[in-house]
Amino acid sequence: MNKQMLLLILLCICIGCISNKSESDLLNKKNPIGIYGNFSSTEKIQNIVDLISNKDVLINKEVKVRGLVNEVCPMRGCWLEVVDENGIDKLRIKVTDGDIVFPLSAKGRNIEAEGQFSILTLNKQQAKNWKKHLAAEKGIEIDTSEIILSQNDYFEYRLNTTGAKIF
């Protein structure tokens, strides 16, 4: 009986391992519609313009935002750039690498996401390194000495996300 039980446990483990999708499978998922992470439908939804306009009040607070996915991290699906309906104001939705994998097919889709709102402030060298890193994720090599920064390159609005709904 112990051998049968052990065999059953091993079989369950093997089936569980086989059915888990790899990070690559999740990144290349054809249909992005769905819930990612822990997402609730109870909080008031902010648009990105209002969030940024009220940043002094909302900084480090839990918020829920709605926008349009403009870009997806091509390496691990660990961030999304989301724009408001005006297409100008943007927010980076960031998750812990591997906790949630947003598919590349999410680009152009609507999203609601919740998490802690923050502002990442960068000095000149950090801003250049960040731009170099973002380019490298796309397979583009650039020399930091050739990067020209704008005022907007010294900070980034972020939502450290615990859950999202893509629709």
Language-model regions: role of each:
Residues 1-27:
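Bacterial Sec-dependent N-terminal signal peptides
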Residues 17-167:
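OB-fold and OB-like single-stranded nucleic-acid-recognition modules
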